[in-house]
């Protein structure tokens, strides 16, 4: 399936929704939304997806990648988002890992995701648990692994944070906690701004930990991140 060169203005819900889809290309898409729940591109249990050269200004998540929801099962893998501009008037520019299969004994995996050469123009979310320009929020028995964020430029955060990496149990959305986050690299990330909340990296407990998070040339207000000073963390990382 190829979606190429369309402009969508004020849809009632998602601009593009993928459920159990394989081999999808979305390119040269422009999306402008202002209604509640009007995410840009949401993918549930999709595989082999390329999102290229899109402009998303949305009144919810610009890009959201999930596992099981509604009638789709089977995990998610091999999704690339590149050469794009994201502007989130509420919620996240990039959000990974929220929905999964709480009834499964082993859960589902979302893996092998690449986000590269992306400009984030704005992030404005007043509800702290849902903040994060680059958010990985593993719930509902999800396992998240092998994620690359590369060459990302963040211009403005009105209300929000830069990074949010969390294994969660949120009763509003989850029936079970997430399982793991393993292998996330942030490379060549820049942000210049003031007033953002501290970034967060947290596991849930000894069985549900965050592992192998790498920062390479991440520069905030001209200073390279060398440690997690200023981050919110816990002992489960």
Explain the meaning of each model-derived region.
Residues 1-237:
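Extracellular/periplasmic carbohydrate-active domains that bind, remodel
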